[in-house]
């Protein structure tokens, strides 16, 4: 499989497309705003005028868009991916969406004779460029095997988890961890600073224990300094938090901590922090604790 399409060129989608181009795949890409296509075009990718055109020129189309509504928009309709099927097309959706929505979208694709996989990932643009994403995949196992070379190019670990929707559930559980880690780290730093303790000492102690995380080692010092390399915005994480709480409601389960965190992130966005990195939730805590 050499002809791969990418629909959606946000920070992650663009990085995935660049990785594939640089690895020798024939990439056709689409984005609503053309400014985001310039670098890819210079690197050798073909730029399509519609998702349909991407599908017409691809064996596999990877979707990387914001939410389920955006997935449906690029997938179905006159200029959607489904209408570009030239036979044996596979669609792989990297977007973070509700598992039940994912299953419904898979059925719509199946009705059009197209196999669809869920392939949400962990890791940002820099990780994607290096081919070091962690991928959770679900859907038809045969279709997954056909795409394995592509997936192994963008991810250093790929987990096949079963039927459609399962990978989406695991992705939501992973983003729940991210949410709580960022908030707990922010509250810990805020507490020690207000206690006249150097937060760097707090981090040194934390990172000397079993409780250290990649976030506490790689992002926490930037949180103290208020200097962020934005790879995943606070507003995007809030969108995923709402998807988590919605999925929990559908399953009939109570997740009290993420429900409270949703309120905190909503307030942070209302205070103007939505466009900074998700670890910038600490800026909201700084503001309310002056």
Residue ranges and their predicted role:
Residues 1-63, 94, 125:
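NAD(P)+-binding Rossmann beta1-loop-alpha1 motif at the extreme N-terminus of oxidoreductases
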Residues 27, 47, 116-117, 158, ...:
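Hydrophobic beta-strand scaffold residues
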Residues 51-56, 60, 68-133:
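Rossmann-like NAD(P)(H) cofactor-binding subdomain of soluble oxidoreductases
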Residues 97-175:
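Rossmann-fold dinucleotide-binding core
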Residues 166-288:
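Helical "substrate-binding/catalytic lid" subdomain
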